[in-house]
Amino acid sequence: MEKLYESMYQLIVETSTKLPKDVRRAILKAKQRENAGTRAAMSLATITENIKMADENVSPICQDTGLPTFKIKVPVGINQIQIKETIKKAIAQATKDGKLRPNSVDSLTGENSGDNLGEGLPVVKFEQWEKDYMDVRLILKGGGCENKNIQYSLPCELEGLGRAGRDLDGIRKCILHAVYQAQGQGCSAGFIGVGIGGDRSAGYDLAKEQLFREVDDVNPNEELRQLEEYIMENANKLGIGTMGFGGETTLLGCKVGAMHRIPASFFVSVAYNCWAFRRLGVHIDPNTGEIIKWLYQDGEDVDFQENAAQEEHLASTDSERRVITLQAPITEEQIRELKVGDVVRINGIIYTGRDAIHKYLMDHDAPVDLNGQIIYHCGPVMLKDENGNWEVKAAGPTTSIREEPYQGDIMKKFGIRAVMGKGGMGQKTLQALKEHGGVYLNAIGGAAQYYADCIEAVEGVDLLEFGIPEAMWHLRVKDFTAVVTMDSHGNSLHEDIEKSSLEKLSQFKEPVFS
């Protein structure tokens, strides 16, 4: 199979940089449902612009290229060891070329391998079948949405919905609750795969397997088809919306599978995937390794360009939204003037900082003066050019809630005035913003090309020993846009949306399926 390496490399690059047609159709449909001038409409306009930029730049749609998971069906007699080794080489090369972010971290030492290889990685699952070609599918599922996966053991009590029993209606309640609990932290609007039955590990495997189905397919099981349709209709009544900003579309796809279980266990497992649903597949000639056919590419191309001029006009004339320009160092007085809903455009220097940096700063001095500065929750994709200078390939926000134990203390300790990420933060941070005079800025999750385009230069880097995603990058930006979703007056859009969506969730308490 002399062409297999080339085919696997192409599959990896295409999966990271180009959304499949079925996903694009779902996003376009969501865009058409939103009311013009809303935060959700603005977010979807940014998302579709980002998709176009990733196409043109052949660069990652989202900087978090996730944990590569391959599902492969092969004819009897094919050398699976050879296939796996070829995939590893292609993964390492794609990482070196900036198509994947180095995401493989030793769980004990915290060391990043730098090439997306390591114990158990990438995940490659084989299955034999009696066909004369190979079926290779790849999903790149980022950490933000992976962390919103959830598993229920029935019977159980669910917030807003009451008791969920061991029946189809209990399953219905679990799925609705799974969408509710994700809020905007998994980069909604999202896609979910649901696995009913099995043990804990098999249930999650089944849930993730559903994500390999076409978005617009029809479940052959009549009960599950009805359940999928019900969830799609009613989950979108929760009002969580794109990025958790509120809106008409919270869920873009729901696929449910079922398997047998043992009498003592009844699990409902939900795999949540962000809007940047990066999964593709190919059929491979087992003799040559060449690609015979691409999967998930049926139907017409989706053109997001048609309404671009209208969106730009609406964005520039929306009288309900204040747009404020900020440049660090920022004063407390400037921060106190900001309120939830304001759109901020940042110029000047921002500093990235995520899990390793926040843990480090609790016990160490900062490598730079952070007084009045902006911390960006981001693990970018970076490459060195031929002159040895760092170049930003992708730079969207990461999920901020992971920094909740540290954020308020660090802001006060170093005088930080703004933190930027996605999905919002909790009560401890909100209280610190109020006491200290700070704001939380929500950037559009997954919009890695859109934000990379706002970065004019990499001015420096500290703590690179933590690995590229976890280092502190000094980025000079221009017109870097985000929304104030938590202000210094105790207001939180995330808290408001969570409260209102819980009220809406409780409307679905009564039985539907007998």
UniProtKB/Swiss-Prot annotation:
Keywords, in A-Z order: 4Fe-4S, Iron, Iron-sulfur, Lyase, Metal-binding, Tricarboxylic acid cycle
Cofactor binding note of this UniProt entry: Binds 1 [4Fe-4S] cluster per subunit.
Pathway in which the depicted protein is active: Carbohydrate metabolism; tricarboxylic acid cycle; (S)-malate from fumarate: step 1/1
Cofactor section: [4Fe-4S] cluster
Entry EC no(s): 4.2.1.2
InterPro entries in UniProt: Fe-S_hydro-lyase_TtdA-typ_cat, Fe-S_hydro-lyase_TtdB-typ_cat, Fe-S_hydroAse_TtdB_cat_sf, Fe_dep_fumarate_hydratase
Catalysed reaction, written as an equation: (S)-malate = fumarate + H2O
Sequence positions that bind [4Fe-4S] cluster: C62, C187, C274
GO biological-process terms attached to the record: tricarboxylic acid cycle
GO MF assignments: 4 iron, 4 sulfur cluster binding; fumarate hydratase activity; metal ion binding
Quaternary structure (record): Homodimer.
Function statement: Catalyzes the reversible hydration of fumarate to (S)-malate.
The protein's name: Putative fumarate hydratase class I
Gene: fumA
